[in-house]
Amino acid sequence: MTNIRKTHPPIKIINHSFIDLPAPSNISAWWTFGSLLGLCLLIQILTGLFLAMHYTSDTMTAFSSVTHICRDVNYGWLIRYMHANGASMFFICLFLHVGRGLYYGSYTYLETWNIGVILLFAVMATAFMGYVLPWGQMSFWGATVITNLMSAIPYIGTTLVEWIWGGFSVDKATLTRFFAFHFILPFIVAALVMVHLLFLPETGSNNPSCLISDSDKIPFHPYYTIKDVLGVLLLLLLFMMLVLFSPDLLGDPDNYTPANPLNTPPHIKPEWYFLFAYAILRSIPNKLGGVLALVFSILILMLFPILHMSKQRSMMFRPLSQCLFWILVADLFTLTWIGGQPVEYPFITIGQVASILYFTIILLALPSISMLENKLLKW
């Protein structure tokens, strides 16, 4: 009798992606973040669905509806904080997943990598619009500042901003459309995830040594399903500790004040996971230049396959590139810290130096060091 998982068309696709998928025998815990991202997306969609049942996208009642969810709905506080902190966990896993891809040269799988970068943009757009929905002070002013960046686009900028706002300022129309987009985007993200996974079996998984592992493959189930379960349990432990013990640790106190267009908060800043890009934006005095630097700070990931000059794929056996990689990581931490600081001396200078360093490492230093390492191989 033939096995249903190998013959039934839809089940066969799942089987080839998660059960009988041939996986290298030496992949480390860094490869767990893909499945953890899937879990984060599932948590976000489910908690978001329950929140949407009670939320109202109207400027007069949005803030009150979130308060109502926390106070009156059964376990509403838990659902709300799981959704808010779930976004943070999502981005932690995303950054680690991308970092692993950079370290081990996974960007040489062009289709998978480029769809991954598009996914990153889609998730960032979703998170930004979600931050606007509670209609607190930081929601309102964050939406105003970030959407206003579009006005830097020549000729069509102002018209484009007013078109996004649905009026002459961030108001009811803006909130309603942001809620609509915030609701639909996660499902688009889920569809993109399917495409992302679809390209993976075409090339097979990468591995830490970056050597061809065709001669030594093992089935994904049970070996890596068990390994992923450990990652899931650890993630849920950290996640629930954050949600139950310090749910407001990563939030902004200003968002507990209802939105007031007449009162600007002293420091307007986005959520922590956007701070590195926000710091790059602020470090350039010109508005259009800042916007271009902001977009390019993420879009630069698509250039990695072109900038790869090394004869080796991974950084595992390239100590000089490793040093640069960890300097880049430290630089991103610095940018994140600077993004949350007021615009004054010495933070402006630190931000500018860190921004220049970020682009210099990626565009100049890494390719140059890779070419030097190629020479050293012959030495």
Swiss-Prot record:
GO terms for biological process: mitochondrial electron transport, ubiquinol to cytochrome c. The chain crosses the membrane at residues 33-53, 77-98, 113-133, 178-198, 226-246, 288-308, 320-340, 347-367. GO terms for molecular function: metal ion binding; ubiquinol-cytochrome-c reductase activity. PROSITE patterns: CYTB_CTER, CYTB_NTER. It is a multi-pass membrane protein. Binds 2 heme b groups non-covalently. Keywords: Electron transport, Heme, Iron, Membrane, Metal-binding, Mitochondrion, Mitochondrion inner membrane, Respiratory chain, Transmembrane, Transmembrane helix, Transport, Ubiquinone. It is found in: Mitochondrion inner membrane. Disulfide bonds: none annotated. One of its GO terms (cellular component) is mitochondrial inner membrane. Its cofactor is heme b. Heme b b562 binds at residues 83, 182. Heme b b566 binds at residues 97, 196. The cytochrome bc1 complex contains 11 subunits: 3 respiratory subunits (MT-CYB, CYC1 and UQCRFS1), 2 core proteins (UQCRC1 and UQCRC2) and 6 low-molecular weight proteins (UQCRH/QCR6, UQCRB/QCR7, UQCRQ/QCR8, UQCR10/QCR9, UQCR11/QCR10 and a cleavage product of UQCRFS1). This cytochrome bc1 complex then forms a dimer. PANTHER family: CYTOCHROME B. Belongs to the cytochrome b family. Component of the ubiquinol-cytochrome c reductase complex (complex III or cytochrome b-c1 complex) that is part of the mitochondrial respiratory chain. The b-c1 complex mediates electron transfer from ubiquinol to cytochrome c. Contributes to the generation of a proton gradient across the mitochondrial membrane that is then used for ATP synthesis. This is Cytochrome b. The lineage of its organism: Eukaryota, Metazoa, Chordata, Craniata, Vertebrata.
